[in-house]
Amino acid sequence: MSTAEQRLRLMQLASSNLPIGGYSWSQGLEWAVEAGWVPDVAAFERWQRRQMTEGFFTVDLPLFARLYRACEQGDIAAAQRWTAYLLACRETRELREEERNRGAAFARLLSDWQPDCPPAWRTLCQQSQLAGMAWLGVRWRIALPEMALSLGYSWIESAVMAGVKLVPFGQQAAQQLILRLCDHYAAEMPRALAAPDGDIGSATPLAAIASARHETQYSRLFRS
């Protein structure tokens, strides 16, 4: 696959139109807004930076790197182990449901794009979008850092668009936020991908509480 084709595939994977339900979940933000923890755009940026620094950089990216290497080596046992570890790091039922739902949706795309994906790997990909992205990145010969950029941009944009609806703030503020969050992501991503096993784990107790409380929140825009 040529470099141009690979870049276009990355754009497709990062697109908000990818039908995996990324905009259906708020990851606890909806309850945090109702509770008064995130009252304005400045508070939202602080909240999201904390989720990135203490969650995405310490769980998602290190585990994505391990899943990618397992796919490179064809080591499904390792991929299964790290996928189970990822689900264990999702601290609420809501977060685990999101992971599985996004994985199932991505696996349906995978069946269309790569119908020759082995059944055992397809079953694994149904459990987590990260597993599916890792397998597809290896199959399409897209390097790990490039896949991680696509994954991160999609996560940032989904979070900011949730903030637009919930906090709320306008589209211009949203674009400024995306720029700043992307700069932070690009600066810290290499270190997160290289994190040792002992550093894996989240430190976002307020986000876990917000997600748990969102499961029974009376009025909701986002899924639980």
Curated annotation (Swiss-Prot):
Q: Name one GO cellular component term.
A: cytoplasm
Which Gene3D superfamilies did the record assign? Urease accessory protein UreF (1.10.4190.10)
Per UniProt, subcellular location reads as: Cytoplasm
Q: How does it assemble?
A: UreD, UreF and UreG form a complex that acts as a GTP-hydrolysis-dependent molecular chaperone, activating the urease apoprotein by helping to assemble the nickel containing metallocenter of UreC. The UreE protein probably delivers the nickel.
Q: Tell me the function of this protein.
A: Required for maturation of urease via the functional incorporation of the urease nickel metallocenter.
Q: Which PANTHER family match?
A: UREASE ACCESSORY PROTEIN F
Give the family per the record: Belongs to the UreF family.
What protein name applies here?
Urease accessory protein UreF
Which species? Answer: Klebsiella pneumoniae (strain 342)
What's the gene? ureF
